[in-house]
Amino acid sequence: ETTGKKKAELVEEIYVTAAKAEGFRDIKGILQIRPDSSGIIHAHGYMKSNDDAFVPAYLIRSARLRTGDVIEGSLRPSRGGDKRAGLAKITTVNGMDPEQIRNRPKFGDLTPVYPNEPLRMEHGKDSITGRAIDIVSPIGKGQRGLIVSPPKAGKTTILKKICQSISINNPEVHLICLLVDERPEEVTDMQRSIKGEVVASTFDMPADNHTRVAELVIERAKRIVELGGDVVVVLDSITRLARAYNLAAPASGRILSGGVDSAALYPPKRFLGAARNIENGGSLTILASALIDTGSKMDEVIFEEFKGTGNMELKLDRDLADRRIFPAIDPVASGTRNEDLLVD
């Protein structure tokens, strides 16, 4: 159809049609850079698929791309012997012109400060959980929080309520809920309950998939923060992520009690340590659940390693949950560092 179209629009349409006829096609996905400096664009979220595309190293260098960037571009048809189609042209990076993001700051160079802008949890008259969190351990943008929970104390419900509160009270925040080693039905429930990205690696997937997805999620969050955005990552759970690293990482030879390899605790610490409030705009908030009283010595060792790393802790009480008192928050053991910056 050519009626009413300008010459430039017609030329563009002819170019696109000819490119498609030759086998070129569009792609949009998240970039993951490999150790050999080439990259892969994941076309379907954070998971590997047959539609993933190869990105040559020279394109990554010339455009100064980083893992976690969302790339839009066109693919050339795969040649004989190629596993997958290759990226021929970059159209946008993170929704912007590639030239605009060439000089963006590095995440590690940004100045971290204490959280000073609150993320209110209370919304409406029925948000008892949100009100309790606001009083006991307020959350701010850039918080590094641990939700410490024994089994069956309502941890998943509280995480869900936190996600719902953030999407209602702070719609400008980019919300990512990361579920590691979870049951598939809980993933579906979370997808239907919250407005935000739900990224899951279920318990029937290998440990190296858990670690790969977690690293890609945190890199994606860093790319948003570098451009001045606010991100909240809700992780369920840091204990299972550490277990996955313990299985997937090569053995260092130094084994702690409970069978935990000492080298396996560094990557999840790096994940949690990425949370920070940036001085001149932007923040990365991480709220991670940690399991206790599971009867596993490994879980106990993992929790002890992470106990002092957060600046906010919300502890759930099994005795309250057994008496059907919800939310089962322990007000004495819970709290936030420098909470005076978050309370009016």
Locate predicted features.
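Flexible glycine-/small-residue-rich
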Residues: 14, 33-35, 43-45, 75, ...
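P-loop NTP-binding catalytic core
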Residues: 65-67, 77-147, 153
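Short, charged/polar, Gly/Pro-enriched secondary-structure boundary elements
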Residues: 16-24, 95-99
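Phosphate-interacting basic helix/loop segments used at nucleotide- and nucleic-acid interfaces
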Residues: 23-27, 128-132, 217-222, 271
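S1/OB-fold single-stranded RNA-binding interface
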Residues: 20-73
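Conserved phosphate/pyrophosphate-binding and hydrolysis machinery centered on Walker-type P-loop NTPases
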Residues: 3-8, 24-27, 45, 80-84, ...
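Basic helix-extension-helix modules of the SAP/HeH family
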Residues: 1-21
